[in-house]
């Protein structure tokens, strides 16, 4: 019913393992996002830095110093671009994370967040409401 490729955000903000943590924070704030995938020089996913990781860094040190690699989550749940959207939805419902990276041949090609799924699922409902409203009046 729903295609992963149609739902995922393809213009993904990413960082490298050696990106300074203060720059990661700047990107989170500037793009109003809650997590940034960490990729290597071949665009392979090696981790993710989330707001939770940043708070963890702040709890053990004063200020924001270090690199993305030092504070990233290494075991990241990801999906292939051809995986079923229902499986992705179930994963986001049953786990604490808010987004999942989408891979193709092991390389990052997109990301799907809870917000992306809600927006995509509700879009047809909004269209039906407009049509229904127009027909009624």
PLM features: what roles do these ranges have?
Residues 14-32, 39, 79-96, 103, ...:
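The conserved cystathionine-beta-synthase
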Residues 84, 107-137:
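Cytosolic regulatory modules rich in charged/polar residues
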């Amino acid at each position: 019913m729903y295609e992963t490729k149609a739902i995922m955000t393809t213009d993904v903000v990413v960082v490298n393992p050696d990106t300074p943590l203060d720059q990661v924070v700047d990107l989170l704030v500037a793009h109003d996002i809650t997590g940034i995938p960490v990729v290597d020089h071949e665009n392979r996913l090696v981790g993710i830095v989330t707001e939770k990781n940043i708070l963890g860094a702040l709890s053990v040190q004063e200020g924001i110093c270090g690199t993305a690699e030092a504070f990233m989550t290494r075991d990241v749940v990801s999906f292939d671009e051809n995986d079923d959207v229902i499986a992705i939805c179930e994963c986001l419902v049953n786990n604490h994370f808010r987004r999942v990276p989408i891979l193709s041949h092991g390389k990052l090609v997109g990301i799907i967040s809870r917000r992306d799924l809600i927006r995509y699922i509700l879009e047809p409902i909004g269209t039906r409401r407009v049509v229904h409203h127009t027909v009624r009046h």
